Amino acid sequence: MKEKNQVVPDEVLSKEFLSRFKTEADVSKFLKQLHAQVLEKMLEGEMDAHLGYEKNSVTGNNSGNSRNGSYPKKIQTEHGESVISIPRDRNGQFEPIAVPKHESRGLSIEKLVISLYAKGMSVSDIEEEMREIYEIELSTSAISIITNKVNQAAQEWQNRPLDPVYLIVWMDGIVFKVRDNGKIINKTVYLCVGLKQNGLKEVLGMWVGKSESSSFWMGVLTDLKARGVQDILITCTDNLNGFTDTIRSIFPQSSTQICVVHQIRNSCKYVVYKDKKEFTADMKNIYNAPNKEVAATELDNLEKKWGGKYPYAILSWRNNWDDLTVFFQFPLEIRKIIYTTNLIENLNGKIRKYTKSKLSFPSDDAVKKTVYLSLMEIEKKWTQPIHNWGLIMNQFMLIFENRIQI
């Protein structure tokens, strides 16, 4: 015998209550209002958890943040369009989960669990959150089954076809603590971010390795080529020995710019604290020079002033001069986006924001799953071309006219 699907107890569905409904349209209208009311209650619960105290509680006095009213938002449900009130906090830090920003539909339980996981919450934390805020009982095993579905999505994303040409590709890595053969060790998630011909950024993939080496990056670049990348106009990298030669072996026409910010940090390692501010200001004259010739003169000036005291701080500039000054070949607008890896370092900072609650990961798959979800959240905001895109694209077309496919 089929089990009766009884979500609401019989005592709630009294004759008096049911007498309110004359047609199916009446029921649908009620369900739409109920749906909106439940979502608003869920959002209020999220705000309580975000602030750490309930509405009107004296605990919130002088806490540094408080409620700041609400704003209306239209959402689409299976019962039609509704308008609900989204609570705000005074510091503007509240990120709704049940009804995410920039989305017009509330989340299913599965999407809600994955969204919480992407925010850096552990399985046990999610179980507690679902029970206390959303009043949903969900076991840790059920939550694990849901989050494990992310692995397949991450693998499909990692293997997806890529564009044939990228104007710029930034390459860098971010280190995590990961359990490996019973020991917690440092592993790096290597990331490539490409600039597309429409001015939008795209994370091309992520690769996990124990240590950075030119041979490791050879595998990364080979993977990009296998997925359809035929040409990269400019690559931006850190100063890894042999990296430039590795790039040229896979993409021989690519120009490689070593990150100037990495170079500055490397030089400052040899400088005592009291001299760092002045030394850094003198280095700034090098990369802010109008052309490579003036930059070379500024490097000479730096060496005359500091070379006797800090010879190794100058030596790395000399040894990497050609790869550090590639950006002088390009107009100012392109220079600004290639002589640092700030873009990918900002990406790494946002990933850290999502993973800060994870002191270590039990496996490589766990790292990949968490970083993948973080990237999906971050890429939702990459909806606009980079600044001055029309001008920059025209410059690329003039410089690389035979290599850009319109």
Locate the predicted segments by residue.
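Subset of Sec-pathway N-terminal targeting signals
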Residues: 1-69, 76-79
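Acidic/histidine-rich catalytic cores and adjacent linkers
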Residues: 3, 252, 285-406
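Short hinge/gating elements
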Residues: 20-33, 95-100, 107-111, 129-132, ...
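Electropositive nucleic-acid engagement tracts
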Residues: 54-57, 61-64, 121-168
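Basic, short loop/linker segments at the boundary and entry of helix-turn-helix/winged-helix-like folds
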Residues: 64-119, 135-145, 164
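RNase H-like nuclease fold core
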Residues: 87-90, 98-103, 136, 140, ...
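Conserved beta-strand -> loop -> alpha-helix junction used to position metal-binding or nucleic-acid-contacting
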Residues: 234-241, 246-284
